Swiss-Prot record:
GO cellular component term of the entry, any: chloride channel complex
UniProt-annotated glycosylation sites, renumbered to this chain: 155, 162
Protein family per UniProt: Belongs to the proton-activated chloride channel family.
GO molecular function: pH-gated chloride channel activity
InterPro entries for the chain: TMEM206
GO-annotated biological processes: chloride transport
Name assigned to this protein: Proton-activated chloride channel
Gene (name only): Pacc1
All ranges on the Cytoplasmic side of the membrane: 1-64, 319-350
Extracellular side: 86-301
Modification type Phosphotyrosine: residues: 10
PANTHER family, A to Z: PROTON-ACTIVATED CHLORIDE CHANNEL, TRANSMEMBRANE PROTEIN 206
Phosphoserine modifications at: 9, 14, 24
Natural source organism: Rattus norvegicus (Rat)
């Protein structure tokens, strides 16, 4: 578009130059014919010659003013093109330095079963069972029940303290998100010397990777170093709804993070008074929704658009310089013709 406008302006300016040259030549021929008709002995009047010179001077002034304005316009266009080039390069560098975070969601039919690492301490696991949508009423709370979950006990050294041993109960998490699968666990703590009772837990992305790992202790040390841990208290049923976030790092690696929403419901203890001294813990793990959130940094700077814009700006600079050069030549040529005709008129009068 810029190239077409500039080409059209160039053609119009060339046509104006040719018209000015033709008009000047025709004026010279008319003057010569007038001198030949009047003869060598006839001298035109001083008033007519002065009026003719004044008209020509006015036309030359207008042409010079027009040429100067045209040059100023082209210089302004050149300044705008230079600023556009500078701004384009600056924006491109800023976009390279500051990528934009992109968030997308991928729907899945089922998840890879996560690992649930529980640190019960002195608490005892009473029951662990997979349910779908609804948890049936407790038949005998505080008493051992069904255990149809895949679990494994493991002891390992704390990753931040070599003198502390960690004892973890690893439970396979839910998979069927569309069927609203959930895992319900019940613990019992007989005696505790602490003022507050709670059980720590952490979530990691794949229970299968844990089972296939030759160094399970090292695997759990890495998980405890990378993931955050949470707690659920006794005397309540804590419902944990999990969601998975995958973040793509700058080096191409993919980091997995669990986000969770918890809701706590008070447990109405209807056991006999003799059994109420035993603290009960209830926890439910369920997927929040079937969408995996993927986060990555993207660079919005498009090099091809930048190159195209720079090419257009440089083309505008080139055309503006060409027009300015042509305008200067035109102004010099008009000035020379004016001086030449002025000299001829002076010689003719003398």
């Amino acid at each position: 578009m810029i190239r077409q406008d500039l080409s059209t302006s160039y053609q119009e300016l060339s046509e104006e130059l040719e018209q000015v040259v033709e008009n000047s030549e025709q004026a010279d021929e008319r003057d010569k014919e007038l001198v030949q008709v009047q003869g060598p002995g006839v001298v035109p009047g001083v008033d007519n010659e002065s009026a003719s010179s004044s008209i020509r001077f006015s036309k030359a002034c207008l042409k010079n003013v027009f040429s100067v304005l045209l040059i100023l316009i082209y210089l302004l266009l050149m300044a705008v093109a230079v600023f556009l080039v500078y701004q384009t390069i600056t924006d491109f560098r800023e976009k390279l330095k500051h990528p934009v975070m992109s968030v997308s969601y991928k729907e899945v039919d089922r998840y890879d079963a996560p690992g649930i690492a529980l640190y019960p301490g002195q608490a005892q696991l009473l029951s662990c069972k997979h349910h779908y949508e609804v948890i049936p009423p407790l038949a005998s709370p505080g008493q051992p029940g069904d255990r149809n979950c895949t679990t494994q006990r493991i002891n390992y050294t704390h990753p931040f303290s070599n003198h502390t041993m960690q004892s973890a109960l690893i439970v396979q998490g839910p998979q069927e998100v569309k069927k609203r699968e959930l895992v319900f666990l019940q613990f019992r703590l007989n005696q505790s010397d602490e003022d507050f009772s709670a059980i720590d837990y952490l979530l990691f992305s794949s229970f299968r990777e844990f089972m296939q790992s030759p160094d399970k202790a090292g695997f759990m040390q890495a998980c405890e170093s990378a993931y955050s841990s949470w707690k659920f208290s006794g005397g309540f049923r804590t419902w944990v709804k999990m969601s998975l976030v995958k973040t793509k790092e700058e080096d191409g690696r993919e980091a997995v993070e669990f986000r969770q929403e918890t809701s706590v419901v008070n447990y109405i203890d209807q056991r006999p008074a003799a059994e109420k001294s035993t603290q009960l813990f209830f926890v439910v793990f369920e997927w929040k929704d079937p969408f995996i959130q993927k986060v990555q940094d993207i660079i919005t700077a498009n090099p091809w658009n930048t190159i195209a814009l720079l090419c257009g700006a440089f083309l505008a600079l080139f055309k503006a310089a060409e027009f300015a050069k042509l305008s200067v030549k035109w102004m010099i040529k008009i000035r020379k013709r004016y001086l030449k005709r002025r000299g001829q008129a002076t010689n003719h009068i003398s």
